[in-house]
Amino acid sequence: VALCIGLSVYAATALADDPFRPEAGKFPPLEKAHSYRGELVFVDHANRRGSLRVEGTGKFYRNDPHPFAMLPYGIVRYHGAPADLRDIPLGTLMHVRAFLPPDPKTSVVPVLPVDSKSKDAGHYRGTGIFPAENHVLLLEDEPSHCLREGLVWKLREVEIHNGEGTITATRAPAQGDAPKAVEDMMTFDSATRIWRGSERIGVARMVADAAWPASGKKKLGGQPVQLGITWKPAPGDGLGGAFTRFHISDIWLDEAAIEQAAQFQTETHKAFIRGRWMPAWVDAVEYGKFGRATVTATLFGGMDASLYADFQKGVQAQMNGAENTLKHAGGHYGPGHIASNGRITAITQADGKIPLGSSGIQIQFETDLIIEGIRPTRVIRVRPQSWPSRQVPREEYVNDSLEERFPTPAIFPKY
């Protein structure tokens, strides 16, 4: 008996110590994700992967690009709106919530030791720059992060010489203040975009309006704004000065300005999803006779509400197999050529808290000819017939090769 109890305790302890990995068919809890941020330096948009220069404890410019992959239900946000990786300019500072690879054997990016984030990378790079948690649930730029968290940047002081300089600011709750907020000093220059309402202005206009001095310093009194943040190499030999100093690409001076930016990005993403179809995964399949089937699927989250509104009971639709990269399974004559045709017979909205990655919307789809790729836990794409039937470019669908279905991590340099 004592031996059995001992083995049970050991097994329970071992299970508790096992690192968390997302499972197929389940949306992982956001609170179990590892958080970090870094500069976007490479994008393979067709395979939903790329590299970030992750901020650690050392000199930022020395940090090697760190590969990441989006989970199939992973969400990208830019300017406070849904986005695709192709929408994000290189150099943008991104906030990340990520997990260990769900299945290391099929990871499209290099798999690292679980404790990588705690190891000192050496060469003045410090710790934290190579997290093993490189499968991303949420990837968002600075204004998206602040809007989601209810934060703003409060400008404290500007210093300007010859049209460029630095801004000192604190990130704090939009309502109230953060007594222990740490001041950040960031650079700007004449290329920094400044948005006021629907108008784009620049540094020269801020000087002309006497909002900023022509030269020297000025206190700004905690003016609340949203900032777009990037990174650019700083002057000097890298032996001294600030280890990490970020650069301001955009300043949104008021709510109208950031709302307009979000609206433009929303329209860009809506057009993209209508052309590529809504991603989802299969919860269950009930097979009938002679190829007939009823498919229950959950639509992925993070899209504009108007896209979900197009999924209505009784509408005709198409459903196609897809990979974890969201690539269509075949598309020589368009993804609709081999997709299952049918209609949506039921729509269910989940109650309670919806996990990030899920829309909470479940559809039932009846077809008289189900294709191979539509199986439980598999990723699919689905299109209401009201959406346009379009071709997709060659890099966005798979053919017969294993390399296209399971992209290798070998494209990433070993620094």
Which residue ranges define each predicted feature?
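Short, flexible, surface-exposed loop segments at domain boundaries
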Residues: 9-73, 78-415
